[in-house]
Amino acid sequence: MSEEQPHANLAVPAFKTEKEPITQTRNGQSSVWRFGGSDKAAKASTVTLRGVIYMLFDNCGKDVNKTILPLGHGDPSVYPCFRTCIEAEDAVVDVLRSGKGNSYGPGAGILPARRAVADYMNRDLPHKLTPEDIFLTAGCNQGIEIVFESLARPNANILLPRPGFPHYDARAAYSGLEVRKFDLLPEKEWEIDLEGIEAIADENTVAMVVINPNNPCGNVYSHDHLKKVAETARKLGIMVISDEVYDRTIFGDNPFVSMGKFASIVPVLTLAGISKGWVVPGWKIGWIALNDPEGVFETTKVLQSIKQNLDVTPDPATIIQAALPAILEKADKNFFAKKNKILKHNVDLVCDRLKDIPCVVCPKKPESCTYLLTKLELSLMDNIKDDIDFCVKLAREENLVFLPGDALGLKNWMRITIGVEAHMLEDALERLKGFCTRHAKKTETETESLQALKLSDNNLEM
């Protein structure tokens, strides 16, 4: 697979390494402003999905008589069929009316919410978490930020999956962590390349990230594979950061297994939340869970660093923290079943339609997540250089936005969002088929027929 960094082919703003002083004049006297914008986030901002999506929207054709179909990013909450369950809404309303969610909370989160998260996670674990093992965050993304800041030290590196979730790359860049990539293997149903991990790790490696259920591949790792991951991490002396935010979004046959089950082998730091399972990303509530029966996080001062970083960052809204126990305890299984049934239907719909589009292939149906990864067979197409070129021209000609795989570290692949209403996917696939037909390489017979037709037209004109 390509060693290029995500977004390597996309234009990004240039930043001066030295800022020129800006002079201002007033009443005939000149002085220099002593402030200026920082470029600390410049590198991190070049590996975010938003920049790619905005670029594709900018390329949508203003003269194309079709509505824009935004299937490059995922937010199912905007569609009525994915509205969250009434129990979750009632939990927030009850706290709002009680007035119990209006105050500040402690940096780690309010105790009832931390206890509820521990109880929720303990259903899948052989050891028991306590509230002291749980730290609430403003969504899973803030959890990533807290953990990366807690691990950052001079020369440290972290192992991230390819393809992966670009926010990890962005936060590593912001925190000064060197990123090293290990591959997920499509020919092995996106399993982790464990031999590759051993090849890239060294004495400065601090952790590896496992996303399970996987975003963007949609696979769910088996018990045996996760045990091998834990054994590999222990051999290397590194912790495992397990992103499990899609644990309630599974519609395949493989059951979800929490990485925390293997905490007796290696310390596991779990990142999770309710944004995906309950389809409420705007509520911004997630958590960090320390699966560490041997107390390694305390002796290595990772626990201390997490607490210190939480002290200097914003807390999740207290009103949502206060509602969290009821949200977790009163979860309606029928809601999850309905949501996952819709996603499964959408996966089947897309895969069925792709059978008629030879240049776009889905090697493996996803079993989780809200995306579907497809491989572009560019050898079957004319005048398409790569996945970015494909997606830009698709946006320009069809007002259809898909995410190029390059943004995820997977060159010449493409990600399709399935967390939308089915009629949008039907429309999108008709547009995709038309686009691919126009750009398909002509066979020798077709080329000869076109040439003959042109000659015939010329003779008629004469």
Curated annotation (Swiss-Prot):
GO terms under biological process: adventitious root development; amino acid metabolic process; defense response to fungus; glucosinolate biosynthetic process; indoleacetic acid biosynthetic process; regulation of cell growth by extracellular stimulus
> Which SUPFAM superfamilies does this entry report, sorted A to Z?
PLP-dependent transferases
Entry cofactors: pyridoxal 5'-phosphate
Keyword terms of this UniProt record: Growth regulation, Lyase, Pyridoxal phosphate
- A Pfam family that this protein carries is Aminotran_1_2
Q: What GO molecular function annotations does the UniProt record carry, in alphabetical order?
A: carbon-sulfur lyase activity; pyridoxal phosphate binding; S-alkylthiohydroximate lyase activity; transaminase activity
Q: Name one GO cellular component term.
A: cytosol
Cite the InterPro entries for this sequence: Aminotransferase_I/II_large, PyrdxlP-dep_Trfase, PyrdxlP-dep_Trfase_major, PyrdxlP-dep_Trfase_small, TyrNic_aminoTrfase
Give its E.C. classification number.
Answer: 4.4.1.-
What does the UniProt entry report for the null mutant? Answer: Hyperproliferation of lateral roots. Small and epinastic cotyledons and true leaves. Rare floral organs and sterile flowers. High levels of endogenous free and conjugated auxin.
Family note: Belongs to the class-I pyridoxal-phosphate-dependent aminotransferase family.
Job of this protein:
C-S lyase involved in glucosinolate biosynthesis. Converts S-(alkylacetohydroximoyl)-L-cysteine to thiohydroximate. Functions in auxin homeostasis. Probably required for glucosinolate activation in response to pathogens.
Name of the protein? S-alkyl-thiohydroximate lyase SUR1
